[in-house]
Every structure is written in structure tokens, then in C-alpha cells.
Amino acid sequence: DGGLGFNLKWNMGWMNDMCHYLKLDPWFRQFHHKDLTFSLMYAFSENFVLPISHDEVVYMKGSLRGKMPGDDWQQLAGVRAFTAYLLAHPGKKLTFMGAELGQWHEWNFASQLDWYLLENKENQQTQRFFKDINRFYLSQSPLWDIDFSWEGFEGLVADYNHNNVVVFVRRDRKGRELIAAVNFSPVGRADYRFGVPPRKTWREELSTDDTAFGGTGEWRDEKPVRTQAIPSHGREQSIAITIPPLGAVILRGAGEYKKPKAKKSKAREELPA
């Protein structure tokens, strides 16, 4: 008679895969790319929650920041990239307190969060990032309107493991589309080309590399990117964008792309013999 009354299920497979992936040095992530993509094989078989709960930041497992390899900048950039990936991935979201502060320490039930970290600029910027991206998430219906069906998701780049990049579309019931491009490598990608749905232009709406969040601000496309009639990834049209190192960008599609008409070549006139 309706079971236990629950309507969502924690996606523990996704959680385990991602925690393993995030701890890897970026060089070795290319050999474990399936940790990043396998969840899409079964993402719509249940109504899933994507959990980074208290259980993932205790018992020597490390805080979210503590899971990331690299120096301070790379760790916090990794937190931002992963959080953007989490919010763009199909499914409801759950993150445990403390991640938004960028704290090193694991959760300790006997003490409070490390609020003193907010005396540091980098931790203030991380907190602002979490505030802004959560507001952005709530304001963008393609990110949450269709979380439990293929109608709300379309993969664009999934199998190119050598560069640690994934790109996919999120879509709402009115057909509005966003593209999420996430780079889990410390190497920025300029002019990164991939096939896209037939929209006229794509504008960058959010970048985790924003200077307000502690990013460099150097890896971005300030103007809308026009769709070109260049085949890529199995599509007739594509765009080339900038993806920051250990970063993510979210693009909004606008207008309708129309394939250019082929130019008619003039027939050569035959000269009389």
C-alpha cells in the first residue's frame, strides 16, 4: 500500500564514485573517468538525491575541501567545480554544513563549525560562491524542473576522458536550455569545441572562475558565442568556448539556429569549338 512513504532515494553509488574521483590527482582522473559519468547510466531509474552528507566528512574521510588534491587555490577551485557539477547533475541535492566555508577539518559533533575561517578572504569568497550559485540554481528552472527523466537531460561530451571534461544540457518543460561544461583538470581549455542543440547563440551565465569567488577571471567568454556550421560530437553545428582550469561554466541558449544554405556554383560556360 504505497511502501514506506518515501519518494526520493539517496544515490550512494554516485556519492562513492565522486568521493573516489575527487581525491585523485587530476592526472590520474583520466583513467577513472567512468566515476564521473557512470551515474548517468541509471540516473532516471529512481528518483534520486545526490548526497554529500555528514557521513562523507567524518571518520578520516576528509572535509569536501580536504578531499581535493593540490594547493589552497586548487582545492577551493575544485570545490567550486564540483559544486557546479552537483547542481547541474539530474537529481535533488544535499550538501552538509561546513562545505560553504571551505573548512579543512572534518565535522565534529562536539564542536561548532570553523567560523573563524571567515576572517580569511579566500573563505569569504567561497561562502559567497555558495550563496550566489544556490540563488542561481533556484532562478534557473532547467536545472531542477525535470530531474527524473531523460527529457530534462542530454549529454554532449562524456567519453573524452583524456581532458577530464564533461558537457551536458539541462532542459525545462518549456524547452529552455542551459549547457553545463565542467573541467576537472588544472589545465584551462581555450576554444574547446563541441556539438550543441540548434540555438543561435550561447551566453555565459555563470563561471566558477569569477574573481568574486576566488577565481582568476581570465578564462571566460564575455560575448555570446555564435553557433557555427562545424560538425562536432555527432552534431551538424557546434560552438567553441573557454572552460577555466578546475572550473565550470553554465551557458544559456537563445534564438534558433538555421543551417546556412549551400552556395550554388555557377556552371562553366562551354566555348564553341
Task: State each model region's role.
Residues 1-28, 37-43, 104-107:
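Substrate-binding cleft/loops of secretory-pathway carbohydrate-active enzymes
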